[in-house]
UniProtKB/Swiss-Prot annotation:
Major subcellular location class: nucleus
GO biological process: maturation of SSU-rRNA; ribosome biogenesis; rRNA processing
A Pfam family assignment: Helicase_C
Compartments (UniProt record): Nucleus, Nucleolus
Upper taxonomic lineage: Eukaryota, Metazoa, Ecdysozoa, Arthropoda, Hexapoda
Cross-referenced SUPFAM superfamilies: P-loop containing nucleoside triphosphate hydrolases (SSF52540)
Bias (Basic and acidic residues): 36-47, 77-86, 505-561, 571-586
Keywords tagged on the record: ATP-binding, Helicase, Hydrolase, Nucleotide-binding, Nucleus, Ribosome biogenesis, RNA-binding, rRNA processing
Species whose genome carries this gene: Drosophila melanogaster
Protein's name in the database: Probable ATP-dependent RNA helicase DDX52
Length: 594
């Protein structure tokens, strides 16, 4: 059998087509036989040769059959029914609307956003009286958060919403509550709205009272716990439909024997500023919220969380407790509003802050102005300094009585106070109309705190301005806030963006325990024992660095550059008495020489 016979045998029944461009598989390729030496040439019978040829012929033919081109059957285009075409068109329109207004949603079967309050009347049978109340408050067109949150809550879906400050979140949860409750019932509380501060809860209550006019619904705000027994006790015949309060007061009433509140009929459970209520650390509301949520035993209740920032504790709690959850985000998550002009101002030291704020006053401030500090002690100190400068200023903090705080907020709203100094107490949700400037006198401990602070200005589309002072000690937290300013359309120096990122553990520590800052004062105060201790510890550190430098190679070169600095620091840190003694010795030596 020669080469031609072998080729014919191999190619028997094979058809070569131009269409098939596939390379032959490893099984179909002819593999060279292993070389056999003449001395070890195997002896085979003719029968075995024929059997092998038949086997190879079968294998090749079998493999070649798979190499033939398979014609794919053309897919039949699915014809959509008129209903399916309408659904597809509606979904495309909803996505276009979301893209236009920067709305992002997560969840199954999320309803499309609404473009007007009239759509709610048509699709969800909104109360005519409620729509009239909205128009009387000049709410003629829904904001992006309202466009998406209203249809979700009107379907009684669990919701976690994040939208910038001043975007209309309060109206987004009050409207579905009022429309869902419809009219007054004597069963008791059917809606519970919780806020982290009394001022914010009072603001929500005022808004709710305006929207429930002539609807028959009764809204209540717990101003004093002592009066709650008369209004919520078993002897009281008056029943409220909506309760707005802080977690502390609600939990206190639940812990009384017997409990003064019955939350078993609650149909709506809403948390405003949920990230503050759920945050970890000192003065948190987690335990209180767990007790209150357990008391709301109605299995059909609708739960909604609203905030300007997303945090991990809120997301964990929502995923653990809520079913069929919808998540809505407006714009960039955890970002500031674009209507606020943001500035970072380096002031050098704590003393430079007073100089900077007085320069701003000299240039001409446009009231009203909010000034944020990190503690109530510093708020008092700054108040005294600015009061002596003749500025129309007031201060609000936790040590002031509730009556004083209410009067202070009222005066600031009316415009009789131009500058209001406050702590983090006023950084959440409070809506002051027309605040032109926010000054972060003390650098915010976290980026979330910064977003909420500057959110007191530039609300409802109005322009605003925010100035943040920072010293050398604040540079470690500078990068995060610089990124927020850049993401919201502002300009920051490039070196701020290239700074080292802070570790999570360090960021948590600084959030829990802010920096220990110098007192706000222009007075020259005498040195105290605490100052002497501080100086002695600093002196020890300087001496320790000198020892380390001496042990290094090339110490002389290094010391020449640093010796002057270390010497100046040591002379400043040494007690005044020792310095005087040294000066007297030097003068005596000079006199003796003369």
């Amino acid at each position: 059998m020669d080469e031609h016979d072998i080729f014919k045998l191999i190619t028997a029944g094979v058809r070569f087509t131009k269409k098939s461009k596939k390379e032959p598989s490893s099984k179909q390729q002819l593999q060279p036989l292993p070389e056999v030496s003449k001395h070890e040439e195997p002896v085979k019978s003719e029968e075995s040769d024929k059997d092998d040829e038949d086997i190879t012929e079968f294998r090749l033919l079998d493999g070649d059959s798979s190499n033939q081109p398979k014609r794919k059957k053309p897919k039949k285009e699915k014809t959509l029914s008129p209903k399916e075409l309408e659904i597809q068109k509606a979904a495309e329109e909803a996505n276009e609307t979301r893209k236009q207004y920067g709305i992002r949603v997560l969840g199954k079967n999320v309803p499309p956003p609404v473009d007007s309050f009239g759509t709610l009347t048509r699709d969800f049978k909104m109360l005519p009286r409620l729509q009239q109340n909205l128009l009387s408050r000049n709410f003629d067109h829904p904001t992006p958060i309202q466009m998406q949150a209203l249809p979700v809550l009107l379907q009684r879906r669990a919701l976690m919403a994040c939208a910038p400050t001043g975007s209309g979140k309060t109206l987004a949860f009050l409207t579905p509550i009022i429309n869902g409750l419809r009219a007054h019932k004597t069963t008791g509380l059917r809606a519970l709205v919780l806020a982290p501060t009394r001022e914010l809860a009072q603001q929500i209550y005022r808004e709710c009272a305006e929207l429930t006019r002539e609807t028959g619904l009764r809204t209540h705000f717990i101003s004093k716990v002592s009066e709650a027994k008369q209004k919520h006790g078993a002897e009281c015949k008056q029943r409220y439909d909506i309760l707005v309060s802080t977690p502390n007061r609600v939990r206190f009433l639940l812990q009384q024997e017997p409990p003064l509140l019955d939350l078993s009929h609650v149909e709506w459970f809403v948390l405003d500023e949920a990230d503050r209520l759920m945050e970890e650390g000192q003065n948190n509301f987690k335990e209180q919220l767990d007790d209150i949520y357990a008391a709301c035993s109605n299995p059909t209740k609708c739960v909604a969380f609203f905030s300007a920032t997303y945090t991990v504790p809120v997301a964990k709690w929502a995923l653990r407790h809520l079913k069929n959850l919808v998540r809505i985000t407006i714009g960039v998550q955890n970002s500031a509003t674009e209507t606020v002009q943001q500035e970072l101002l380096f002031v050098g030291s704590e003393g430079g802050k007073l100089v900077a704020i007085r320069d701003l006053v000299r240039q001409g401030l446009q009231p009203p102005v909010l000034v944020f500090v990190q503690s109530k002690e510093r708020a008092k100190q700054l108040f005294e300094e600015l009061l002596y400068d003749g500025i129309n200023v007031d201060v609000i903090h936790a040590e002031r009585s509730q009556h004083q705080r209410d009067n202070c907020v009222k005066a600031f709203r009316e415009g009789s106070i131009w500058v209001l100094i406050c702590t983090e107490l006023m950084g959440r949700g409070i809506d002051f109309k027309g605040v032109n400037l926010v000054i972060n006198y003390d650098f915010p401990p976290t980026t979330i705190s910064y977003i909420h602070r500057i959110g007191r200005t530039g609300r409802a589309g109005r322009p605003g301005r925010a100035i943040t002072f920072f010293t050398q000690e604040d540079t470690s937290n500078l990068r995060g806030i610089a990124l927020i300013i850049k993401n919201s359309g502002g300009t920051v120096p490039e070196y701020m963006l290239q700074m080292k990122k802070v570790r999570k553990s360090e960021a948590k520590m600084r959030a829990k325990k802010p920096l220990d800052r110098e007192d706000i004062s222009t007075k020259i105060r005498p040195e105290t024992k605490g100052d002497e201790k501080h100086k002695s510890t600093k002196l020890k550190k300087v001496e320790r660095t000198e020892k380390i430098l001496k042990n290094r190679k090339g110490y002389e070169k290094d010391l020449n550059s640093k010796q002057k600095k270390l010497g100046n620091i040591k002379t400043e840190l040494k007690p005044a008495g020792k310095r005087k003694g040294n000066v007297e010795k030097k003068t005596k030596n000079k006199n003796n020489q003369t």
